[in-house]
Amino acid sequence: MVCTPAENFNNSLTIASKPKNEAGLAPLLLTVLELVRQLMEAQVIRRMEEDLLSEPDLERAADSLQKLEEQILHLCEMFEVDPADLNINLGEIGTLLPSSGSYYPGQPSSRPSVLELLDRLLNTGIVVDGEIDLGIAQIDLIHAKLRLVLTSKPI
């Protein structure tokens, strides 16, 4: 039986009332959104410091980042996820996100986070080359050869 989005419509409306431990992928997706939001914020700060943004561009970026943060907090409330739980502790690697106020782009930090590493890689630029095989039940179904150029600068 094929399941269409319309068949699951009522289930999706009630997901917000489920307990935290049944929130499914919501905490993970919110964590990724917050990571991307903070990466964009760091890039806006870098461009502001280098005088690469006009005043209207800076205002638009600041407004957009603020609205995105509000939406993430609203979704956290809907799914009963504590925003502090979005910062995952990765053991020896450190935390995913820096603690509030502890990181400013371009400045060294006493306890670097994964976000800081990604921000520095974006600022410097990096090329990732590799192959990915995706599958299920020990059957390779998708083969991909990738070359990814990750940078905040125009290519």
Swiss-Prot record:
Keyword set includes Ligase: no
Biological process according to GO: gas vesicle organization
Localization per Swiss-Prot or TrEMBL: Gas vesicle
Keywords: Gas vesicle
Keyword set includes Ligase: no
GO MF annotation: an example: structural molecule activity
Domain of life where this protein originates: Bacteria
First-listed, main subcellular location of the protein, grouped into a coarse class: other
GO annotations of cellular component type: gas vesicle; vesicle membrane
Protein task: Might be involved in nucleating gas vesicle formation. Gas vesicles (GV) are hollow, gas filled proteinaceous nanostructures. During planktonic growth they allow positioning of the organism at a favorable depth for light or nutrient acquisition.
PANTHER family recorded: PROTEIN GVPK 1
UniProt similarity note: Belongs to the gas vesicle GvpK family.
UniProt protein name: Gas vesicle protein K
Protein species of origin: Dolichospermum flosaquae
Taxonomic path: Bacteria, Bacillati, Cyanobacteriota, Cyanophyceae, Nostocales
